[in-house]
């Protein structure tokens, strides 16, 4: 966590904000120390998916959880490594925080996150966001990195209906 890395992040976040219109807060970049580790946030999303699946909830609830994590980190500048970071997000998405905390701090929670990482690697994902299309057991890379919706639709259409 040095000035060069903070400068890199500031530049990247400004670029992403300019391209996507997504808001960013830069307060974390003023901190004298911050361990920029994405594993806890990834683990939290994996744990939320497990808990929501137990309750029979669908994936939109998991997407809401993910979106809230992104907002709280990138806009509000809170630290996702602390389990209490997720308390309000659990409340917003109907997840018991006590259940979440137990899973988040457990080996099973860490293994769930690792399984997600392993699955991404197996599919050839090396950066985020990545958009893949799977058809008849074959995967097609539509985008690696940000892509405007219209361009994504064009690539999907081209992949599904190649010219003959």
Regions found by a protein language model. Give the residues of each.
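C-terminal cap of thioredoxin/glutaredoxin-like
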Residues: 54, 68-164
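Structural alpha/beta surface segment adjacent to cysteine/selenocysteine redox centers
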Residues: 1-72
């Amino acid at each position: 966590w040095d000035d060069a890395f903070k400068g890199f992040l500031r530049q990247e976040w400004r670029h992403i904000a300019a391209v996507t219109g997504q808001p960013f807060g830069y307060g974390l970049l003023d901190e004298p120390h911050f361990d920029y580790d994405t594993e806890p946030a990834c683990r939290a999303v994996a744990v939320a998916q497990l808990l929501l699946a137990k309750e029979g909830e669908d994936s939109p609830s998991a997407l809401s959880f993910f979106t809230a994590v992104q907002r709280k980190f990138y806009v509000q500048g809170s630290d996702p490594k602390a389990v209490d970071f997720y308390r309000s997000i659990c409340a917003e998405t109907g997840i018991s925080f006590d259940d979440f905390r137990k899973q988040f701090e457990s080996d099973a929670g860490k293994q769930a996150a690792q399984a997600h990482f392993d699955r991404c690697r197996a599919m050839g994902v090396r950066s985020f966001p990545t958009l893949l299309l799977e058809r008849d057991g074959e995967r097609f890379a539509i985008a690696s990195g940000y892509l405007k919706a219209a361009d994504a639709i064009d690539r999907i259409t081209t992949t599904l209906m190649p010219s003959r």
